[in-house]
Amino acid sequence: MEKHITTPITQEITKDLKSGDYVYITGEMYVARDAAHKRMIEALDRKEELPIDIKDSTIYYMGPSPARDGRPIGSAGPTTATRMDKYAPRLLDLGEKAMIGKGKRSKEVIDAVIRNKAVYFAAVGGAGALLSKCIKSSEVICYDDLGAEAIRKIYVEDFPVIVVIDSEGNNLYETSIKEF
């Protein structure tokens, strides 16, 4: 099924998303990879506040290439989600509602998705130039010393993703194997 949603992505939205749904997202989301995730968890361990508003947030696992003239961002394809698996459950428990990446997730992440009624989306790997056309603005908001791995806030219009793991734990990577 095809659905259009806007951020922030709340539990009201995630409960209606099913594994295998094609979804187009419009709104603000964060961009962060493993180095930024590690810093956020280290900040939490020191009892510091996160540098982003995690409640009902969407984090896209991506490291952009430099922007061309007149564009907000360069190629913007997803990175492998498993690199964030050791950090994601804690952020989900704090209110993150959606993750976008590519590839499988650990049992701990899937359990946290179910527990928090969140969702894991996949974006098409190898299509970073096309995906970047959906990104209308991009701003580094923290950890700028990390370069391409700094946390960004982006605004997207009709950003295409597929629900891989829905809020009930249904996993497209498992069900599609059985189907085909």
Segments the model singles out, each with a brief description of its role:
Residues 1-9:
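Short, structured beta-strand/loop micro-motifs enriched in basic residues and often containing a Trp
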Residues 31-32, 36-159:
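Feature captures the catalytic cores and cofactor-binding loops of soluble hydro-lyases/lyases
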